[in-house]
């Protein structure tokens, strides 16, 4: 026999032998121990409600759990989709349930609905990431950890009676690999029974043709296989929610009162509310929790670990150790870092060269501009000098003319001042002669 065959035989696990017990041992109480531990620890269940504002999400939650949850009134004017989680502690008999209801506020209210699903996907991934980080801790405490992973998404469909909106198809397609989707037709009392039946068939046909995987109630457990198979044929559930009590006959029932009659919430002839409650809470709640952990979370965890460099070993190869994975990832990181550093260095060198060329070009342009301005300045200076010389010549000529004029004016003034003096002398001479003549003549 070859060495490889010997290794294969030695590595094969032996078949366990079945033995009969000679008396009572006591490990048949393990289920009771598990139940007792689970009851002591309590349970958590997280519901995501996706649907347009005013479609009845809060009312249906109140009706499902037969209580009134305090919620804020949603507005139709939300700028974007916002996830609003609220956690409640519920007690039924001796079972404690930590219920978290996450409402997609503002879904479908925007004009541009292309990215309406993005905040929902990011929220679901964020809860997976939180759980993964808790698992990867050296000192982890999953027993006390508040698990916020979404266990079921109730997708509320507007009762148009025609077909699914493109927003519904795109959103459910983005969510089906991350969460258990149960589609429900809200406000089913607004359309007739015949239209409702056609609408259900139309919805399921569109989901199948577009490859949308919704949650199917499990049929592998014999205890619930029959009822789950029947309920799978009723999807999507057409529901009516109400917390008001109306008197019908001699008893009060939760119903909606209309002028034409009463729609009873828990009457299966009126709507599928009872079917939804049975499938969601009383029959398949634990399966929803298990599917979230074993299917959706494991898919997210596997993708994240593969991104970190971890991978499963083949049957014929040696298993990878954590140290080997770390070293391989470290080498990959260092080589990538070195490559990035070289790229950045080369980029820096190229940038420096480009900057030097730009600076030289700027320097040349500035030098040319300086020379041009220098020539312009010299030309302006020459013109100013010419203007100054012309102005000086004009000033000198003006001064010469002014001096000549002033000389002429002084001469004329002198001449005019001499003329009255002669006249006075002539008058005096004339008066003297006349007096002489007057004396001599008797």
Swiss-Prot record:
Residue intervals of the Septin-type G domain: 41-307
Keyword DNA-binding: no
Modified residues (Phosphoserine): 10
Region G1 motif, annotated ranges: 51-58
Pfam families (alphabetical): Septin (PF00735)
Coiled-coil intervals, chain numbering: 322-410
Classification via CDD domains: CDC_Septin
Sorted UniProt keywords: Acetylation, Cell projection, Coiled coil, Cytoplasm, Cytoplasmic vesicle, Cytoskeleton, GTP-binding, Membrane, Nucleotide-binding, Phosphoprotein, Synapse
One of the record's GO cellular component terms: synaptic vesicle membrane
Region (G3 motif): 103-106
GO function term, MF aspect, one: GTP binding
Compartments, record wording: Cytoplasm; Cytoplasm, Cytoskeleton; Synapse; Cell projection, Axon
Signal peptide (from-to): none
InterPro entries: G_SEPTIN_dom (IPR030379), P-loop_NTPase (IPR027417), Septin (IPR016491)
Residues annotated as binding GTP: 51-58, 106, 187-195, 241, 256
One record GO biological process: regulation of intracellular protein transport
PANTHER family: SEPTIN
Role: Filament-forming cytoskeletal GTPase. May play a role in platelet secretion. Seems to participate in the process of SNARE complex formation in synaptic vesicles.
Protein name, per record: Septin-8
């Amino acid at each position: 026999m070859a060495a490889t065959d010997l290794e294969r035989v030695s590595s094969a696990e032996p078949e366990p032998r079945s033995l009969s017990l000679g008396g009572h041992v006591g490990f048949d109480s393990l289920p009771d121990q598990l139940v007792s531990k689970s009851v002591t620890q309590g349970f958590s269940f997280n519901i995501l409600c996706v649907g347009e504002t005013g479609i009845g999400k809060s009312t249906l939650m109140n009706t499902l759990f037969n209580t009134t949850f305090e919620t804020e009134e949603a507005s139709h004017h939300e700028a974007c989709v916002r996830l609003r989680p609220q956690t409640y502690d519920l007690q039924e008999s001796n079972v404690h349930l930590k219920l978290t209801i996450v409402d997609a506020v503002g879904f479908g209210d925007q004009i541009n609905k292309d990215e309406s699903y993005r905040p929902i996907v990011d929220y679901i991934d964020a809860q997976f990431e939180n759980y993964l980080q808790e698992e990867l801790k050296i000192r982890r405490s999953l027993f006390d950890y508040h698990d916020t992973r979404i266990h079921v998404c109730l997708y509320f469909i507007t009762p148009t009676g025609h077909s699914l909106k493109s927003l519904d198809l795109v959103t459910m397609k983005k969510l089906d690999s991350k969460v258990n989707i149960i589609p429900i037709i809200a406000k089913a009392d607004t359309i007739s029974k015949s239209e409702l039946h056609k609408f259900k068939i139309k919805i399921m046909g569109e989901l199948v043709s577009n490859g949308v995987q919704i949650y199917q109630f499990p049929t592998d457990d014999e205890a619930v296989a029959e009822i789950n198979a029947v309920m799978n044929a009723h999807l999507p559930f057409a529901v009516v929610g109400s917390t008001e009590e109306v008197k019908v006959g001699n008893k009060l029932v939760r119903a909606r009162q209309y002028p034409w009659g009463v729609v009873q919430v828990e009457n299966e002839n009126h709507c599928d509310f009872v079917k939804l409650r049975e499938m969601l809470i009383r029959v398949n709640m634990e399966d929803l929790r298990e599917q979230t952990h074993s299917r959706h979370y494991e898919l997210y965890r596997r993708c994240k670990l593969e991104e970190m460099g971890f991978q499963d070993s083949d049957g014929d190869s040696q298993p990878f150790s954590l140290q080997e994975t770390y070293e391989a990832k470290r080498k990959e990181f260092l080589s990538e870092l070195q490559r990035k550093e070289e790229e950045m260095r080369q980029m820096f060198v190229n940038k420096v060269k480009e900057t030097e060329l730009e600076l030289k070009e700027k320097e040349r342009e500035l030098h040319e501009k300086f020379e041009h301005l220098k020539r312009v300045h010299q030309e302006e200076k020459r013109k100013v000098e010419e203007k100054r010389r012309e102005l000086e010549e004009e000033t000198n000529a003006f001064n010469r003319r002014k001096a000549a004029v002033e000389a002429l004016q002084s001469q004329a003034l002198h001449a005019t001042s001499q003329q009255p003096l002669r006249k006075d002398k002539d008058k005096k001479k004339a008066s003297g002669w006349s007096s002489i003549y007057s004396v001599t003549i008797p």
